[in-house]
Amino acid sequence: MDIPDFSSISSRPTIFEFEGISMINHFTENWEKVKNFQARPDDILIATYPKAGTTWVSYILDLLYFGENAPEEHTSQPIYMRVPFLESCFKVIASGTELADNMTTSPRLIKTHLPVQLIPKSFWEQNSRVVYVARNAKDNVVSYFHFDRMNIVEPDPGDWNTFLHRFMDGKSVFGPWYDHVNGYWEKKQTYSNLLYLFYEDLVEDTGREVDRLCSFLGLSTSVSDREKITKDVQFDAMKQNKMTNYSTLPVMDFKISPFMRKGKVGDWKNHFTVAQNEQFDEVYKEKMKNATVKFRTEI
């Protein structure tokens, strides 16, 4: 396995407005190819707000489809090569669209953090299946903060309070969390090929959610295979697995924080002060006043 050389990326990117949301250059420089990406009817798009369970669900789907057929891939190819990140564009590695276009497997598993309004229209036109994963805002912002601390291709997060307020204001990369989770929830009402999963449900009963995925995708995976996959995708197993824990990517400083940190529900209680929690709840109530999607901040 060739490890990409990211040494040429020496400074963190700056945030700017793009298509109505906050973005960084690594996700906009290939925009024409992203926008005009040609989806296929059997593609499966894994969509999430950053740090909401993308890698977890990517790995579940990868094992469901290819665990038996290509076991060697799971020990030699990291997940970010097996499930291309559609909008990613780093000069030192093939872009997400290029990786996806060159995939020989079927179905293609492709991940994105784009809000629903920026998804390439061919996915909808081809009636591709979309698996969306949503995570409660409080745990999501904590995970996003630690991720940005350890990842040099992300903007400088500043201190916790600064990062929290940027998130509350909807100025994090990939835009407001509120719009992201609501946008896909509303799309689900009119687009039947979209499955909406909750991170909290995955933590609570991974096997049940694997069953839901199989049902949605029309897979007849045996009970024993489902049980094995459920075991293989538990947090501690994935955290130790070099093909899923991103330890092969040199842009991440694991001395600051691991890519897979805790994988729990309710860790926000270790970060929010009482004042921050009250302020967050006030903003949340206003931003989500018309939303019908509901979240659990503890299980």
From Swiss-Prot:
Keywords: Catecholamine metabolism, Cytoplasm, Transferase. Its EC number is 2.8.2.-. One of its GO terms (molecular function) is sulfotransferase activity. Its main location: cytoplasm. 3'-phosphoadenylyl sulfate binds at residues 51-56, 135, 143, 199, 233-238, 261-263. Pfam families: Sulfotransfer_1. The active site is at H113. It is an enzyme of class 2 (transferase). It is found in: Cytoplasm. Optimum pH is 6.0-9.0. Gene3D superfamilies: P-loop containing nucleotide triphosphate hydrolases. GO terms for biological process: catecholamine metabolic process; sulfation; xenobiotic metabolic process. Inhibited by Co(2+), Zn(2+), Cd(2+) and Pb(2+) ions. Inactivated by Hg(2+) and Cu(2+) ions. It comes from the Eukaryota. Thermostable from 20 to 43 degrees Celsius. Belongs to the sulfotransferase 1 family. Sulfotransferase that utilizes 3'-phospho-5'-adenylyl sulfate (PAPS) as sulfonate donor to catalyze the sulfate conjugation of a variety of xenobiotic and endogenous compounds, including 2-naphthol, hydroxychlorobiphenyls, dopamine and T3 (triiodo-L-thyronine). This is Cytosolic sulfotransferase 1. It comes from Danio rerio (Zebrafish). The gene is sult1st1.
